[in-house]
Amino acid sequence: MKGRTSNSTGIKDWADIDWKVVNTQVSKLLHRIFRATRNARIGSGSWKKVRSLMKLLQRSFSVLLSAIQKVTQKNKGKNTAGIDGFIAIDRQQRSKLMNSWNWTEALPTRRVYIPKRNGKKRSLGIPAIKDRIGQAIMKMAYEPVFEISFETQSYGFRPGRSCHDAIEDIFQTLKQGSTYKWVLDADIKAAFDNISHDFILKKIEGLPGRNVIRKWLKAGYVEEWKHYYDTESGSPQGGIISPLLSNIAVLWSTRTAFRL
């Protein structure tokens, strides 16, 4: 995917954005993709329309504005720079981002290590701001396509769901009937680090933006600002699109394991 996102609104300054209009337009696009996907799955629609709507979303100026807002204002890591050292902390920098945005080559992530409660450390890959914005756009394009496929009992990293919902689901399941029920307490070791690139790319084959996602997966990472390493597997824990890719991998892995 190349080129700039067309700005037909005439807006040049971040302060002039009407967020009510932006949010409405983004919401409508997301619902259109979801409905088109649902119709394609039941045979009353076409996947061609789904792909067309995904492309429309990826080029939408309103979606770009929403992505910039999420990355530079709402996300916890908004003040943390990637390998290029850039963050957008003020109106002028955000205005520059929205006016000069284009799909550029993926940069390596900046890898840092965060202490865990057990004394060990977990790796965190921090993409550059522009890559985070691109990932936020792709997440919005892909999420409604795959959300319809995810299991009802899946709660991790999904919009509108939380650990409290999972607890309530378990409680309701256990209290039904008088038969014994099994509870499996398991952990996927280093889930983000072990995602197969080939597996993910196969599952999103034919969808617009696949090549961009491939570049993010293969971009590598840098430690201590100087040592570069290739990435043959995994998606950085810190990448905006990583939780969605993880859920896609888990969906088909569990279906295979439990023959769902």
Residue ranges of predicted features:
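Charged boundary/loop elements
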Residues: 12-77, 140-156
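Reverse-transcriptase-like RNA-dependent polymerase core
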Residues: 70, 96-120, 133-142, 168-177, ...
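Conserved polymerase palm-domain catalytic core
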Residues: 152-153, 158, 165-260
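Short, intrinsically disordered, charge-balanced linker/junction segments flanking boundaries
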Residues: 33-44, 94-97, 255-260
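Short, charge-rich, low-complexity alpha-helical interaction segments
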Residues: 1-7
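Phosphate/adenylate-binding "loop-and-lid" substructures adjacent to NTP/NAD/dNTP-binding pockets
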Residues: 47-121
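Short, conserved non-catalytic motifs in the polymerase core
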Residues: 75-87, 107-133, 149-162, 184-185, ...
